[in-house]
């Protein structure tokens, strides 16, 4: 009989993923969240935040390439980039692969977790925090944007989902926040973001985010990719007022990958463009969605995976 250690991740109250743990690397509680890092046979190191898997060593490159490069490659010359969240440093790592980048500002509220990543997760950041183009700001992203006058060519939003009615991240998923992001984009700028899992039990989460972003930007395009460490598809968004980010001109993405000499492990130009081809049921869900998340009534995700709205009382 196997008496090993196991981590149980409750996707909903009715579905659970079980992972065997080889050893515990680090665990603790910051002012913002609980963290737990363990070693597994299948996926290497696994980062848990508030009891949910956030990233795994073996496949993090799939998630981070999917998040970062569509936005970076649709922009002809991204020089200044803002990253909202992204505590492990892998989003920053991927942004800095683009030689056009002169400055990349990463704003994360949880400085303690960033230090955990620096110490225990070098496979993710790979020294990105030490790059002279990188600027790390420990602050609430909304407060930072309300205070700064800096503008960016690309903004990448890499946040945890707003799970739970008391989750302060809810205020980073509102139309007012997306308008604030847009106000800090240079002309021709683009926003890219993680936009929730695409799962039958969570069928409205991505459509609600998409519908909300549409209130702030002229062009909004969804795309998706399978993330093995999550055992499901994740949704992402590109948004811009200047151009349709999914209207790919033939050969442009491939040419930019070649010109920038990008060392990609997962994405190719054809695959990147194919991620924007969505199935009929998802297209219909995006078309039918009416919920818009606002500061007065921000949305949140219930333990069952439902999208709900309620005033934030935090």
Swiss-Prot record:
Q: Give the range the annotation lists for the signal sequence.
A: none
Keywords for this entry?
A: Cytoplasm, Polyamine biosynthesis, Transferase
pH profile of the protein: Optimum pH is 8.5 at 60 degrees Celsius.
> Under which EC number(s) is this enzyme classified?
2.5.1.104, 2.5.1.126, 2.5.1.79, 2.5.1.22
Pfam families in the record, alphabetically?
Spermine_synt_N, Spermine_synth
Q: Give the catalytic activity.
A: S-adenosyl 3-(methylsulfanyl)propylamine + agmatine = N(1)-(3-aminopropyl)agmatine + S-methyl-5'-thioadenosine + H(+); norspermidine + S-adenosyl 3-(methylsulfanyl)propylamine = norspermine + S-methyl-5'-thioadenosine + H(+); S-adenosyl 3-(methylsulfanyl)propylamine + spermidine = thermospermine + S-methyl-5'-thioadenosine + H(+); S-adenosyl 3-(methylsulfanyl)propylamine + spermidine = spermine + S-methyl-5'-thioadenosine + H(+)
Active site positions: 158 (proton acceptor)
Highest taxon listed in the record's lineage: Bacteria
A Gene Ontology term for the protein's cellular component: cytoplasm
Where is each PABS domain found?
A: 4-241
Recorded GO terms, molecular function?
Answer: agmatine aminopropyltransferase activity; spermidine synthase activity; spermine synthase activity; thermospermine synthase activity
Query: What CDD domains does this protein's entry cite?
Result: AdoMet_MTases
Role: Involved in the biosynthesis of polyamines which are thought to support the growth of thermophilic microorganisms under high-temperature conditions. It seems that long-chain and branched-chain of polyamines effectively stabilize DNA and RNA, respectively. Catalyzes the irreversible transfer of a propylamine group from the amino donor S-adenosylmethioninamine (decarboxy-AdoMet) to agmatine to yield N1-aminopropylagmatine. An efficient aminopropyltransferase activity has been also observed with norspermidine which produces thermine, and spermidine which produces spermine and thermospermine.
Q: What is stated as this protein's family in its record?
A: Belongs to the spermidine/spermine synthase family.
Q: What is this protein called?
A: Polyamine aminopropyltransferase
Q: Tell me what organism the protein belongs to.
A: Thermus thermophilus (strain ATCC 27634 / DSM 579 / HB8)
What is this organism's lineage? Answer: Bacteria, Thermotogati, Deinococcota, Deinococci, Thermales
Q: What gene codes for this chain?
A: speE
